[in-house]
Design a protein with these regions (language model features):
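Non-catalytic signal-transmission and effector/linker regions of two-component phosphorelay proteins
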Residues: 1-28, 42-52, 69-73, 107-123
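Short active-site oxyanion
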Residues: 7, 79-80
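Structural motif
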Residues: 11-14, 36-38, 56-61, 83-86, ...
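Short Gly/charged-rich anion-binding patches and loops
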Residues: 16, 20, 66, 89, ...
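Short, structured coil segments at secondary-structure junctions
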Residues: 28, 76, 95-98
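Short beta-strand element of Class I
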Residues: 32
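Conserved phosphotransfer microenvironments
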Residues: 39-42, 50-77, 87-90
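Output/docking surface of receiver
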Residues: 81-88, 95-119
Length: 123
């Protein structure tokens, strides 16, 4: 059976939130892979296996700016949704870098809704 790329890869340091996001996105009908840190696993960085959307939470990332600079080499910015966090990059900084963003405080439902909207625009 041929492996296909996931619709979404969730990158988030906190397993409860990551697990809830993954579960809700799966419930919405998406193929989802969830990981706790950047970079994403090598197989998902290969051509033909990259996710349609990368959802990345900046909370607790040691170097958020450098991480987003690396992300730009893997996926086009229009396919990335960044969850901003207090003490990391501001929403304006993320926007200037060309990424979609959603600001904390935010609910799981709001993140799932924003992810679904982005996936719909990319069809």
């Amino acid at each position: 059976m041929e492996q296909k790329p996931p619709d979404v890869i969730v990158v988030g340091p906190e397993w409860p939130e990551r697990a809830l996001l993954r579960a809700q996105l799966i419930e919405e009908g998406y193929e989802v892979v969830a990981v706790d840190q950047w970079p994403i696993p090598r197989p998902y960085r290969r051509p033909g296996m990259k996710p349609r959307v990368l959802l990345i939470d900046l909370r607790e990332l040691p170097t958020p700016r450098e991480t987003l600079d690396e992300v730009r080499f893997v996926l086009p910015t229009e396919r990335v949704l960044v969850i901003t966090a207090l003490g990391s990059l501001t929403a304006e900084e993320v926007k200037r870098l060309g990424f979609h963003f959603i600001e904390r405080p935010v609910s799981i439902g709001e993140i799932v809704g924003a992810t679904g909207a982005l996936l719909s625009r990319l069809r």
